[in-house]
Regions:
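Short, ordered beta-strand-loop transition motifs
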Residues: 39, 199-204, 233-241
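Alpha-helical scaffold segments that mediate packing/assembly in large oligomeric complexes
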Residues: 86-153, 263-268
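N-terminal "assembly arms/tails" that initiate or stabilize quaternary assembly
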Residues: 1-72
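Extended oligomerization regions of viral-like shell subunits
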Residues: 140, 146-227
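Extended, compositionally biased alpha-helical segments that mediate assembly or anchoring
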Residues: 233-268
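Short helix/loop capping segments that flank catalytic or ligand/cofactor-binding pockets
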Residues: 53-56, 95, 167-170, 254-256
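Short acidic, glycine/tyrosine-flanked loop/strand segments centered on an H-E-D-like triad
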Residues: 69-93
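Structural beta-strand/beta-sheet cores of well-ordered domains, especially the beta-sheet scaffolds
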Residues: 41-43, 83, 154-156, 192-194, ...
Length: 268
């Protein structure tokens, strides 16, 4: 498909926001740079789960069950995410905005793809806390469902979609505190030791609560780029004055510890 360029008249250039979400999820997961292999190769990753074991007892009673931890080997395929942007010399001469916008969107599109996979792994968790409203008790129950030995030493976070953000603020009121230490793009506040962030493309009606141990991204390196432009084009591309830019990333994203992620499911 050919690029759309503007004709030769005065134009105010407005570049639309192309990010699905500005909240970067890499700080919220474990990054492992030891990935080996090529696209299509399989990697087996153990996903850990823990069963509940808390019981309310009377005098003389003991627990009838214990917390049990087990794992399931899950097979993942190494992904190669790649995008391509093509333009002709004449396009750039006619519209100076075309190439910068196209190259920038190559990076943005890659970012959206990887970020979507990371959030998708968090959302796979089978631990669910049902709540009619996202109030203080709902977040406390979610925190309690996580397999945490010492919550004081662990950073717990939550992702909420913009449509549910107002519900969270309304339900929590003064229980939602603003802590400067955790302030970053999308930060709403902290409740029950959980830092709550708004994520533009999070699922409505579901609030993911987790620690960074829940999801791991296995990667070789960052995004690599390749440009085929004047001076290194093939004879055919040079003859047509055609340029091409590629962005690539090899990675696997996995829910490596399901006991470290829980969803608050709003049932109202």
């Amino acid at each position: 498909m050919a690029n759309t360029v503007y004709e030769n008249f005065f134009l105010s250039n407005i570049v639309e926001d192309q990010f699905n979400s500005h909240l970067d999820l890499l700080p919220f997961c474990t990054v492992d740079n030891t990935l080996e292999g090529v696209a299509g190769m399989k990697r087996v990753i153990n996903t850990y789960r823990a069963t509940d074991g808390t019981e309310k007892l009377t005098v003389g009673e003991g627990n009838s069950k214990s917390i049990e931890v087990n794992y399931t080997p899950v097979e993942y395929v190494i992904a190669l995410a790649q995008n391509r942007f093509e333009w002709f010399d004449e396009d750039a001469m006619k519209d100076p905005m075309l190439v910068p916008v196209g190259l920038k969107h190559g990076a943005t599109d890659m970012y959206n793809t990887v970020q979507g996979d990371i959030y998708g792994e968090f959302a796979k968790t089978g631990l669910v806390v049902n709540a009619t409203t996202p109030d203080f008790d709902a977040f406390v129950d979610a925190s309690g469902a996580l397999n945490l030995e010492n919550i004081e030493d662990v950073k717990v976070f939550a992702f909420v979609c913009p449509k549910d953000k107002a519900k969270v603020r309304k339900a929590l009121k003064d229980d939602l505190k603003y802590v400067e230490e955790y302030a970053k793009h999308g930060y709403i506040g902290t409740v029950a030791g959980i830092n709550v962030y708004a994520k533009q493309d999070a699922t409505e009606g579901e609030i993911v609560v987790a620690t960074k141990e829940a999801v791991t991204i296995f990667t070789k390196k960052g995004v690599s780029t390749e440009q085929i432009t004047e001076g290194n084009r093939s004879e055919d591309a040079a003859n047509k004055r055609k340029n091409t830019a590629f962005s690539r990333k090899y990675y696997v994203v996995a829910l490596t510890d399901e006991s470290k992620a829980v969803k608050i499911k709003l049932t109202a």
